Amino acid sequence: MGSFSIWHWLIVLVIVMLVFGTKKLGNMGSDVGKAVKGFKDGMKGGEDDKPAAQNAAPSQVADKGTVDVEVKEKSNS
């Protein structure tokens, strides 16, 4: 009584197909597939960015003992 048989699921599937139509269900399926692929690519790309960020940080740090100044000419006014 608590479990659904295959016939219950087939009836639910037929009702869903009648309500939404097969074209709409196909579009929703492809949209979900594209979203999952985009998510996986995003997660994969996020892991690749971490080593590049770690390598770039030390090269940006300047020697703390040096000071960059700009020389301006002194005017005699």
From Swiss-Prot:
<dbReference type="InterPro" id="IPR003369">
    <property type="entry name" value="TatA/B/E"/>
</dbReference>
<comment type="similarity">
    <text>Belongs to the TatA/E family.</text>
</comment>
<keyword id="KW-0997">Cell inner membrane</keyword>
<dbReference type="GO" id="GO:0008320">
    <property type="term" value="F:protein transmembrane transporter activity"/>
</dbReference>
<dbReference type="GO" id="GO:0043953">
    <property type="term" value="P:protein transport by the Tat complex"/>
</dbReference>
<keyword id="KW-0812">Transmembrane</keyword>
<comment type="subunit">
    <text>The Tat system comprises two distinct complexes: a TatABC complex, containing multiple copies of TatA, TatB and TatC subunits, and a separate TatA complex, containing only TatA subunits. Substrates initially bind to the TatABC complex, which probably triggers association of the separate TatA complex to form the active translocon.</text>
</comment>
<feature type="compositionally biased region" description="Basic and acidic residues">
    <location>
        <begin position="65"/>
        <end position="77"/>
    </location>
</feature>
<comment type="function">
    <text>Part of the twin-arginine translocation (Tat) system that transports large folded proteins containing a characteristic twin-arginine motif in their signal peptide across membranes. TatA could form the protein-conducting channel of the Tat system.</text>
</comment>
<dbReference type="InterPro" id="IPR006312">
    <property type="entry name" value="TatA/E"/>
</dbReference>
<protein>
    <recommendedName>
        <fullName>Sec-independent protein translocase protein TatA</fullName>
    </recommendedName>
</protein>
<keyword id="KW-0653">Protein transport</keyword>
<keyword id="KW-0811">Translocation</keyword>
<keyword id="KW-0472">Membrane</keyword>
<feature type="region of interest" description="Disordered">
    <location>
        <begin position="39"/>
        <end position="77"/>
    </location>
</feature>
<keyword id="KW-1133">Transmembrane helix</keyword>
<keyword id="KW-1003">Cell membrane</keyword>
<feature type="transmembrane region" description="Helical">
    <location>
        <begin position="1"/>
        <end position="21"/>
    </location>
</feature>
<dbReference type="Pfam" id="PF02416">
    <property type="entry name" value="TatA_B_E"/>
</dbReference>
<feature type="compositionally biased region" description="Basic and acidic residues">
    <location>
        <begin position="39"/>
        <end position="51"/>
    </location>
</feature>
<dbReference type="GO" id="GO:0033281">
    <property type="term" value="C:TAT protein transport complex"/>
</dbReference>
<keyword id="KW-0813">Transport</keyword>
